[in-house]
């Protein structure tokens, strides 16, 4: 399957124009390549249903949040009608191409929810996916794992492992997430894995001492890119780092550009009451650089360097 590459048009400038107009900055841009990032997000959308989306303000804000992401992993999609996500995509597709992939409804009781991937189908495709086989019933909502292409020669694909823990079993579920990672690697031999979601990994659900002792903290190669102490909650009365992103793999590390929460109430100038109609969580996101070394013919590069010399020596 071909991967989308940032396009670049190369043209040798007229020598006289080059001597007068070129400076070093354009050359550096050419050598470094594009700086566009590929953004992967996770968002606990707080009991997302079709009825919730019929509220115009909720729909408009959700569309703006989703449109920022190349892949979004939604949690707490609780609608069993199969109509919620297609309805949401109708609004999203007005300017770009989107597809989605969802799990079945998961949960031990009458309350169940889905994991849903919404992704830019013009930038990425699903290579494979599976529901983790939780034979020991450790997870309330076992991870729904997906393998995506990426528009990068350095990192052609990445595996996403979402998890929404149940607060009473946070430590047990997060330690079992290491077994999910091993299962992913055994299946696809891909070490570039991003584990993400509402881990409930803070405050009353998980003490700092227990957080430090987690397997994903003590095993080498796992990088928690949302800092401890970063508030991922909307309510002013809480300050908890519930939502997390954990990155593994050399390719992910090489291309890691940024990771952050997205304070959508601040961005969209919402009151706390208005924001809580959408969710009580902020989305969390990681950006992977798409920059790749440009293949510039050596004689073109030499000509460009020579053309710069007069302007630098004047």
From Swiss-Prot:
Coiled coil: none annotated. One of its GO terms (cellular component) is endoplasmic reticulum. It comes from the Eukaryota. Residues 1-37 form the signal peptide. GO terms for biological process: DNA catabolic process. Glycans are attached at residues 102, 133, 239. GO terms for molecular function: DNA nuclease activity; endonuclease activity. Disulfide bonds join 203-240. The keyword Glycoprotein applies. It is found in: Endoplasmic reticulum. This is Deoxyribonuclease-1-like 1. Belongs to the DNase I family. Keywords: Disulfide bond, Endonuclease, Endoplasmic reticulum, Glycoprotein, Hydrolase, Nuclease, Signal. The keyword Membrane does not apply. PANTHER family: DEOXYRIBONUCLEASE, DEOXYRIBONUCLEASE-1-LIKE 1. Its EC number is 3.1.21.-. Transmembrane segments: none annotated. Highly expressed in heart and skeletal muscles. Low expression in brain and thymus. Intermediated expression in other tissues. The active site is at 113, 164. It comes from Mus musculus (Mouse).
């Amino acid at each position: 399957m071909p991967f989308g590459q940032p396009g670049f048009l190369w043209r040798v400038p007229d020598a006289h124009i080059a001597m007068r107009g070129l400076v070093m900055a354009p050359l550096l841009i050419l050598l470094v390549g594009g700086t566009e990032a590929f953004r992967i997000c996770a968002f606990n959308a707080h009991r997302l249903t079709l009825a919730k989306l019929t509220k115009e303000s909720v729909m408009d804000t959700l569309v703006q949040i989703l449109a920022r992401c190349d892949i979004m992993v939604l949690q707490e999609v609780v609608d069993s009608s199969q109509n919620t996500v297609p309805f949401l995509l109708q609004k999203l597709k007005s300017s770009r191409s989107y597809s989605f992939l969802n799990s079945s409804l998961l949960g031990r009781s009458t309350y169940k929810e889905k994991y849903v991937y919404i992704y830019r189908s013009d930038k990425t495709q699903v290579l494979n996916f599976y529901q983790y086989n939780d034979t020991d019933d450790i997870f309330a909502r076992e991870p729904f794992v997906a393998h995506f292409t990426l528009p990068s020669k350095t990192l052609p694909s990445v595996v996403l492992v979402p998890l929404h823990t149940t607060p009473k079993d946070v430590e047990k579920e997060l330690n079992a997430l290491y077994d999910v990672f091993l299962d992913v690697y055994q299946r696809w031999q891909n070490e570039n894995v991003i584990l993400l979601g509402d881990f409930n990994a803070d405050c009353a659900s998980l003490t700092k001492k227990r957080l430090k002792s987690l397997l994903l903290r003590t095993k080498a190669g796992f990088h928690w890119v949302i800092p401890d102490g970063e508030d991922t909650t909307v309510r002013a009365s809480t300050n908890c780092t519930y939502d997390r992103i954990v990155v593994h793999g050399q390719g992910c590390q090489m291309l890691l550009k940024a990771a952050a929460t997205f304070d959508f109430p601040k961005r969209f100038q919402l009151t706390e009451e208005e924001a809580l109609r959408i969710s009580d969580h902020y989305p969390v996101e990681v950006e992977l650089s798409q920059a790749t070394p440009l293949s510039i013919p050596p004689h073109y590069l030499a000509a460009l360097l020579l053309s710069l010399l007069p302007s630098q020596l004047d």
